[in-house]
Each structure stands twice: as C-alpha cells, then as structure tokens.
Amino acid sequence: MKLKNIILSTALLVGFCACDDLFEPAIENHKTVEDLENMPAWAVGLLGHAYISNPLGENANSWKFTDVATDDAVSNDVGNGYLRMATGAWRADNNPVDSWQYLRASWQYLNQFLEISDKVEWAKDEMGSELLKMRFQGDAYGMRALYMYHLLMSCAGWTADGQLLGIPILLESETIYSDFNKPRNTFRECLDQRNRDVEKAIEMLPEEYGDVETTAEVPTKYTQMGADFSQYNRVFGDHAKNRMSARVARAVRAQAALLAASPAYSEGSGVTWEQAANRMAEILANLGTNPIAAIDATGNKWYEDSNGIKNLVAGYN
C-alpha cells in the first residue's frame, strides 16, 4: 500500500510540474514589421537581400558561361542547363535561364524596406539617423531602378495586338491577400517609373563614397542638413564603397535608355538614339576632357603593384 502511494504521489508530482504549454507551440523567432522598427541591423537586412541577388554579381549567376548556348557548341556536363534545354528538359518549372523569380523576389524586399525605413531609428543621434535613412532609402531606390532595367531586358516584349509591354509595376509589398493578377504596364510606363527611382537615388546619394578630411569637402546637400565631415564619413565613407551611388544610378538610366532606343523597342518606347547618347554622355563626362590620357600606361600589369593590391581591402586600387 505504501508503495502504491509513493507511485501515485510521484505521478501527481510529474503531472503538476509538467510544461503548461505542452500543446501550444512556442513563439518562433520570426520578426514582425513592428520588431524591425527597433532593430536597424535587421531592417537593413531587407535591403541586403537586393545585393544577394544583384543581377550584376555572381551570386545571381549573372556572368553565365554561354559559349555552349549556341548551335555549334555543346557542353559535355550532363547537368549543364543549356544541354538540358537542348535535349527537351526546358519547361516552365525548369528554366535554366530564368531571371523573373529572383528579380521579383528582391523587388519585394526593396518595397518592404522602403515601407518601414521612415519608422526605423537608424542611430541614437538625430543627424546620424537622418543620414543613414537617406543613404539606405537612396540605395533602395537605385537598386529598384537596376532591377527594373534587368526585368525589362528579360521580360519586355510586343503583344499580338502591337503593344509594347513591360512588367507589372508594384510600389507596395505583396501579402497573401494581394492581387497577383495585375496586368503588365506599358514599356514606357516602366521607363518612367525607373526614371523616378533614379532621380530619388541621385537626390539622396553621393556621386561616390569615400572619406573626406574637412567639412568643406562634404557635398552641399548634406552640409545643408547640418552634417560635418566626421558624420559624413560615418555614413558615406570608405566603408560604403561598392554600394549604389548617384553615379551608378545615372549609369543604370543610361543603359536602360540604350535598351529603349534599340530597334527592338524604339517604336514603342519613344526613346531615340540621340536621347540615349545624351544619357550616356552624362556618364562619360566624369572621365574628363581627355580620358585616354588618364589611362594608366602600366594598368595591364596591376598584379605587379603591391600597393594597389593592398588597397583592394578598402574597395579601390
């Protein structure tokens, strides 16, 4: 009898000491929009996704080996995408040259970032927070323009009734309740949206990133906000090199203008070769009056310059 009481008491003790949420799942570590407002490092991660799938970087497989994508060459790698396409494995759910999915996924992240960026406390001091917000927002607008260009290059085309269409322009992030059957905007409307994003990027970003030594060297748009050189370096200094800048945004606009002026699209885009040339001239003007003279005579032997190699760490050589 005594043994039974011990067993019963032990069972009751275990029962009363068990977890009270045995049948309720624990809260997962998924951040909400409200969480991100107080977590700037996480919030800027949304912008970081646009760089992970950057169409100009190898993470997005932009630099594809296409020498075997011709009629007179074939890969002997049985897993090669072009070989599989040529032998009947090219399907809607197996497209080795697909770019729509990763480009639109990054577009979604950029929209999510822009929606919360005004609410995030980017730094404890007001000036630092404003400068960081300005840089991150300009970065996002510039990257969205870059993605628009690559989406048009991959997906724009003429319809059977003679319309030149681009992509559906989405300026808000999508949710499970969004309308996923939005019609494609015209090519011209897509160009106009890309130009608006480029203008915002130019308005917010410096021409190039890099440390300055005096406040006199800080671009006017930042000194008008009250920023000195140390605050400028903190946000736009050497550590930010290779991010979207005003010069890169202009280059994106010039490239898209060349695409729009090409014979494939000019009739529907309304962009002429002269307009495209003028856009490209804005970029070439940065090279100076005699760019040929500025070319390093021994630049083809960069590997012999030890200082240049050391400077790669800082993002330049």
Question: Over which residues does each language-model region extend?
Answer:
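Acidic, serine/threonine/proline-rich low-complexity intrinsically disordered regions
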Residues: I167, R188, A251, A260-N278
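Extended ligand-binding clefts on enzyme/binding-domain cores
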Residues: R243-A246, A285, T289-N317
